[in-house]
C-alpha cells in the first residue's frame, strides 16, 4: 500500500478513535455541569483552538493577506452562521441525551445520520438514492428498534434526544455538502463552533443550570478533551487524512468507526454493558452504516453485456 494512503488511513482512524472517546468525555462531563454549560465551554475552546490552525494554513497557502480570498471568507462566515445554528441543535440534543443514555449507545444512534443523509438528500435536493440506501434504511430501522425500543414499545427519553440529534446532524451535513466547495473548511468550523457557544449561553439560564467555578473545574478534563482533542486535533486529522485519501468510501468507513470506539470506550471506562438484544441492534446498525457507504458498481454497457453473453 502507498505510504501516503497508509498515513491517511491511520489519521482518519485516529480521528475516529478520538471522536469515539469524546462520547465518554461528554457523558462524564454531565456529572458536574449542565448540557448547555458544557456545550458553551467546549465549543468556545474548540473555536479558539482552531484559530491558529487556520492562520498557519492560510499563511502556508499565501492566502492570509490575499484580497481574492475575502469573498470566500465572507461567504464562509454566512454559511457558518447557518451551520452553527443547526449544529447547536444537534450538539445540545446529543448532550441532553447523554444524561439519560449510555455513551456507546449514543454513539451508534448518532451515526444513524450516515444512513439518513442520502434519504433526506433525495427528498430535499431531489438527489437519486441508490438501492443500497433503501436496504441500509431498513436494516438501520430494525437495528434502531432492537437498540432503543423496550418491552411495551417504550423508549428511553435519552434515546429520543439522541435520535433527534441524528436527524438534526443530517441537515447539518446536507448544508455543508451543499456549500462545501465554496467555503474554507477550517474557518467554517471556527465560526460554527463560536455560534454554538454563543447560542448555548442564554439556555444555561433558561435551563436553570447551576454554574460555578468548582463545577466547571471538576469537568475540566472532559471540556479540554472535547474542545481541544475532539474539535481541534480530530478535525485537523480529518483534513490531513482526507487530503491523501484515494478512496472516499474507505475514508467514510474509517471515520464512521467512531461509533464502534464509543461502545469500546464506554465498556472499558464507564463499564457500560449492552444486552443481547441491544448488541444485535449494534451489529445491524454497523452493517447498515457500512452498506450505505459502499460504492455502487458502474452499470455495464450494452456492448459489455453482449460480450459476456
Residue ranges, per PLM feature:
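Glycine-/small-residue-enriched transmembrane alpha-helix faces in small-molecule transporters
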Residues: 1-41, 85, 93, 153-178, ...
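Hydrophobic alpha-helical transmembrane segments of multi-pass integral membrane proteins
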Residues: 7-11, 37-56, 78, 132-139, ...
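Helix-helix packing/entry segments at the starts of transmembrane helices
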Residues: 16, 41, 106-112, 176-197, ...
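Hydrophobic/small/kink-forming positions within alpha-helical transmembrane segments
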Residues: 20, 24, 84, 88, ...
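Specific transmembrane alpha-helical segments of multi-pass solute transporters/efflux pumps
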Residues: 22-23, 55-110, 146, 227-245
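C-terminal-most transmembrane helix of multi-pass membrane proteins
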Residues: 43, 51, 59, 219, ...
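C-terminal transmembrane-helix exit sites in multi-pass transporters
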Residues: 49, 53-54, 113-135, 260-279
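Hydrophobic transmembrane alpha-helices of multi-pass small-molecule transport proteins
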Residues: 50, 129-149, 167-169, 200, ...
